[in-house]
């Protein structure tokens, strides 16, 4: 569902173009075993803490206080302050109560995000929003039985509890900022 348009995304796109190394800093989604994101490059702005624990005791201690919905700022969020202004605008528009994951995903021409459904605990807690930073006709976004083209500067909500996928049949990179926001619904 289209929830906003005419968002000025140019300052963020220029900032990203000045820092191409940010696409290579975190390959977690792309490298996830059997994951749907092998054609995706991501800039992680906010995401849950990804820790490695050397002992069972350390892991158990971490899990005793773990909040699966908590996301933390990653270094690129400070490097791209232009993203923060768009995120805060979106939060105000939708009555956001808590900010979760925020990432910028790029799908090359001919690339895709394979069909998948996000985890129920996540989809029941957060609403998923896309802010379109770059796109072109030929990008097909499907959620359930609905296919949409999302234009530059638009903000969309979609039901990520439904099977969804993206196919980039355009000649340009498809770049979206994805924001998970807890709303009062």
Please place each PLM-identified region on the residue numbering.
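Short glycine/proline-enriched turns and hinge-like loops at secondary-structure junctions
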Residues: 124-125, 143-144, 169-171
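A short hydrophobic beta-strand segment most commonly corresponding to one strand
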Residues: 127-132, 155-157, 171-185
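Short secondary-structure subsegments characteristic of cysteine-rich extracellular domains
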Residues: 149-160
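Short, surface-exposed beta-strand-loop junctions and turns on beta-sheet-rich folds
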Residues: 121, 147-149, 173
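Short, surface-exposed charged micro-motifs
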Residues: 103, 130, 165
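Fe(II)/2-oxoglutarate oxygenase catalytic core
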Residues: 1-103, 107-115, 121-123, 138
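Short beta-strand His + acidic residue motifs that chelate non-heme Fe in jelly-roll/DSBH
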Residues: 115-116, 139-141, 158-170, 178
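A short beta-strand-loop-beta hairpin characteristic of the jelly-roll/cupin
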Residues: 132-151
């Amino acid at each position: 569902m289209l929830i906003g348009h005419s968002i000025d995304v140019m300052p963020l796109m220029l900032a990203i173009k000045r820092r191409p190394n940010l696409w290579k800093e975190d390959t977690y989604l792309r490298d996830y075993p059997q994951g749907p994101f092998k054609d995706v490059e991501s800039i992680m702005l906010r995401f849950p803490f990804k820790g490695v624990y050397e002992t069972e005791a350390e892991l158990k201690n971490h899990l005793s206080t773990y909040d699966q919905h908590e996301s933390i700022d990653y270094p690129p969020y400070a490097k791209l302050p232009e993203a923060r202004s768009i995120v805060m605008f979106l939060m105000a528009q939708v009555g956001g109560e808590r900010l979760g994951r925020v990432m910028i995903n790029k799908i090359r021409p001919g690339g895709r995000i394979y069909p998948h459904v996000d985890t129920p605990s996540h989809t029941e807690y957060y609403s998923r929003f896309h802010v379109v930073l770059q796109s072109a006709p030929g990008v097909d976004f499907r959620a359930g039985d609905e296919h949409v083209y999302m234009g530059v500067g638009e903000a969309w909500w979609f039901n990520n509890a439904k099977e969804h996928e993206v196919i980039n049949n355009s000649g340009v990179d498809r770049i979206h900022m994805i924001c998970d926001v807890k709303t009062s619904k």
